[in-house]
Amino acid sequence: LEKYTEQAGLTDSYSISGLPTAKGSFDFDGITDGQLGWAGVGQYHDQVNPAALMIYMGAIANGGKAAEPYLILRTESALGLPSLPHFTTRTGRLISSDTASALADLMANNVTQTYGASRFPNMDLCAKSGTAEVGEGQTPHAWFAGFLRGEDTPYAFVVLVENGGGGSSVAGT
């Protein structure tokens, strides 16, 4: 798990339009088998920066390599016409193409079977919700991360609601 989190970029600091992100961390020192199991589902001493998770979602969407994100300053050209961003720079391989394909299929099934595709009309969405515990007596953070499949909508995303409660019911609506 430690090797995978490093290779997948989940502990990296990324530069987004020149702005550095905080590194993620996983604590594997002296970990028991039970704690390793919890770490594997994000419920031990795991800290993942939302930007790193978004890049990981992009890697799943694109066969193992992600587009490098940047800030979108405007969505129209100087003439006032719609202009969607073009992502031309890619990361190195974060995960294998087989793993990316399997995860994409699982995430698509998750949307259909768990959240209901009707919540996301006209979208080929692959996503997973999560709840991040933040400390004793504090309301957990709600996560919803994924991507849109399709040539005309090649976008990965992360929604994080700090102290929002549970996963998709908060961050996935």
What are these regions (language model features)?
Residues 53, 167-172:
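Short, charged, low-complexity patches
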